[in-house]
Amino acid sequence: MALPIAELRDRFLALQREIVSSLEAFDGEPFHTDAWSRPAGDRLQGDGLTRLIENGRFFERGGCNFSHVRGASLPPSATAHRQELAGRPFEALGVSLVLHPRNPYCPTVHLNVRFFVAHSNDTQPDVWWFGGGMDLTPYYPFVEDIVHFHRTCRDAVHAGGGDDTCYREWKTWCDRYFFLKHRNEPRGVGGLFFDDLGADGNTPFDAAQRLTFAVGDHFLPAYLPIVARRRPRPPAFVVDGLVTVERGHRGRVGPPVGGHLDDMPEDHLVRGSPRRRVERHRTRDGIVVGTGHHLHPLMQRQRTGAGTRAQP
């Protein structure tokens, strides 16, 4: 079967356009565009479209990038777990996204959807697979945001023809893949991660393609409602300090100059860090969060009904 590379390219570019258009409408600032290409004779040939935002009204920095590259020979280092593919011509294309909001109540997010093929040689056919996923990294997490993200991830798997077993496998894979062993903690609250979809020959091309693009198509429904809910900006010292705390794991020991102690988030007064462990939490429809993730005290009071402090 001839692989529909041109069709895949068009679909990845359409996904990039849709995401960037929606994010520009949300932020109010345009993404910068950089079209690039690799000339003939380079080890890697191909082209791509880089879309970047920096110092936006809402997003401090982010990128949504498309690339389509080809090579004449897969190096052995790239085929450690598939040594039989070494030396074969290859092709890879996909979309990758990272967004860092200014507001620490809004999480950083990552999305990647991709396709890879090691082309046929004299004796072997094409070997192809899809991969990707999306995951959320809150600085100041809220249970309802995490549940919404995971629920939409599950909806993506269902929309692509997958079942609950597939969803649980990809969710668990994401938790393992983004676990920081040197800190003995997860990076963020997870989401979906998958790779080698179709490589075993048990998943037809159309089914693997449908699942992969369902994940990409559910990125905006998974993320935009969260940032819209958390769009109002917190006090300036929270923006300046809390992002630094979570990006560098360094706390502050008191209010900023000119600040008032009553304005300090409770967690800063207690420990100088907003990090708390999330106990395991399962919703009625089976969404599980909290396998070692961190939960802010405001969320703990919300869960238990204690306290009356308003949420941001």
Roles of regions detected by a PLM:
Residues 2-82, 204-251:
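Gly/Pro-rich turn-and-neighbor structural signature
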Residues 279, 288-290:
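Residues marking helix boundaries in flexible regions
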Residues 90-113, 191, 222, 226, ...:
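Amphipathic alpha-helical packing elements
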